[in-house]
From Swiss-Prot:
Gene for this chain: rps3
Subunit structure of this chain's protein: Part of the 30S ribosomal subunit.
Domain KH type-2: 47-118
The protein's name: Small ribosomal subunit protein uS3c
Recorded family membership: Belongs to the universal ribosomal protein uS3 family.
Swiss-Prot/TrEMBL GO biological process terms: translation
Molecular functions per Gene Ontology: rRNA binding; structural constituent of ribosome
Highest taxon, organism lineage: Eukaryota
Matching InterPro entries: KH_dom-like_a/b, KH_dom_type_2, KH_sf_prok-type, Ribosomal_S3_C_sf, Ribosomal_uS3_bac-typ, Ribosomal_uS3_C, Ribosomal_uS3_CS
Localization (cell): Plastid, Chloroplast
GO cellular component term of the entry, any: chloroplast
Coiled coil regions, renumbered to chain: none
Length: 218
């Protein structure tokens, strides 16, 4: 049997970079890791509550965290940053306050910056949110995947593979369905592949979505 490995971890140091950049003593490492998770969860929850476009996409591609002794720099890569900034210019400050309250920092400064992504639908996280929104609205899974593949084609990607597992379309027996378009060379380390796994709650139960996007070869 072929062993499945996470494509991002497999390519760390070649085509993929780390999303958290900091150093810690071995005994404090787990604490730093939990801190990162709290920051990411807090940001995602805030965005979920405050912005949603009609398709159900929050638009966060990834969150990078850089830590120094006195400063934590958080960079949010978003596909649709206007949604967070428009209407309420103080939203970023509010978000900063929320995260600071969650982590109760006293002597550490927190700085949040938002970076816009040029082709949002070329990122698996945003695409998974789009498919999840469609499945929640009871759109048939094939239709949802086809639409997602069309969106990635506009983003100049070389290939995409989408897999959905669970009680698809409310069927009694859970199954796994997948569709591939173009090339997705998972064995090639120099191939830059973006990947995400996403859970979506529907009225029939939980579905798992996995997306592999072949961006380019280095």
């Amino acid at each position: 049997m072929g062993q499945k490995i996470n494509p991002l971890g497999f390519r760390l140091g070649t085509t993929q970079g780390h999303h958290s950049l900091w150093f810690a003593q071995p005994k404090n490492y787990s604490k730093g890791l939990q801190e990162d998770q709290k920051i990411r969860d807090c940001i995602k929850n805030y965005v979920q509550k405050n912005i949603r476009i009609s398709s159900g996409v929050e638009g966060i591609a990834r969150i990078e965290i850089q830590k120094r002794i006195d400063l934590i720099q958080v960079i949010i890569y978003m596909g649709f940053p206007k949604l967070l900034v428009e209407g309420k210019p103080r939203r970023i400050e509010e978000l900063q306050m929320n995260v600071q309250k969650e982590l109760n920092y006293v002597n550490r400064k927190l700085n949040i910056a938002i970076t816009r992504i040029t082709k949002p639908y070329g990122h698996p996280n945003i695409l998974a949110e789009f498919i999840a929104g469609q499945l929640r609205n009871r759109v048939s899974f094939r239709k949802a995947i086809k639409k997602a593949i069309e969106l990635t084609e506009q983003a100049d990607t070389k290939g995409i593979q989408v897999q959905i597992a669970g009680r698809i379309d409310g069927k009694e027996i859970a199954r796994v369905e997948w569709i591939r378009e173009g090339r997705v060379p998972l064995q090639t380390i120099r191939a830059k592949i973006d990947y995400c796994s996403y859970r979506v709650r529907t009225i029939y139960g939980v579905l798992g979505i996995k997306i592999w996007i072949f961006v380019d070869e280095e």
